Regions:
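Bacterial N-terminal signal peptides
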Residues: 8-19
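Non-catalytic accessory segments of hydrolases
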Residues: 23-177
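N-terminal secretory signal peptides that target proteins for export/translocation
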Residues: 1-6
Length: 177
């Protein structure tokens, strides 16, 4: 599972950087389709791509299986909305993950990319942030971590959702057969 995530993350970053080098700031082509980013509300020098699918929705027959490749699509998708957080128990009001109205779904394997709005042919540092939460809570959306401040300083920042609790970490021989 980690290897597939790593391959997709590297692919997204490489495409983002290559598109920035050629001045195409608002659209990124991936193996699954083309996404159109938007300007960060925190800093107009940053372009944000939210809700980029890195795997097929892990529902139905895919629920207890390793991630499958993202489902290809035609046209251009607006990458301007935070995806749902992966399914998790409701947290107490004291939890950092309880802020706001957290939408939860099993269809949650998405990532977000924050990058400088001005193109650069230089190699850029990349930071991939996986939220905490003890493998039971959290999400990669900007409610918890917004990569705009690092992106405006020249880094490419990627945040990601991953399956939580039993949906992501349940181990049983019947599930692998």
């Amino acid at each position: 599972m980690f290897r597939l995530k790593r391959v997709w993350l590297i692919h997204i970053v490489a495409l983002t950087i290559s598109n920035l080098a050629f001045g195409q700031l608002s659209e990124v082509a991936t193996d699954s389709g083309t996404y159109r980013g938007h300007i960060s509300p925190i800093d107009e020098r940053v372009t944000v791509f939210q809700g980029i699918g890195y795997a097929a929705p892990p529902v139905g027959d895919l629920r207890w299986k390793p991630p499958s490749p993202a489902i290809p699509f035609a046209g251009v998708r607006e990458a301007d909305r935070v995806s749902a957080a992966c399914w998790q128990a409701r947290n107490s009001d004291a939890s950092v993950y309880a802020r706001g109205n957290l939408n939860r779904s099993e269809d949650c394997l998405y990532l977000n990319v924050f990058t400088g709005a001005e193109g650069s042919a230089a190699d850029l540092p990349v930071m991939v942030w996986f939220h905490g939460g003890g493998n039971t809570a959290g999400h990669g959306g900007p409610l918890i971590f917004d990569g705009s401040n690092l992106a405006k300083r020249g880094a490419v920042v990627i945040t990601a959702n991953y399956r939580l609790g039993a949906f992501g970490f349940l181990a049983h021989p019947a599930l692998t057969s």
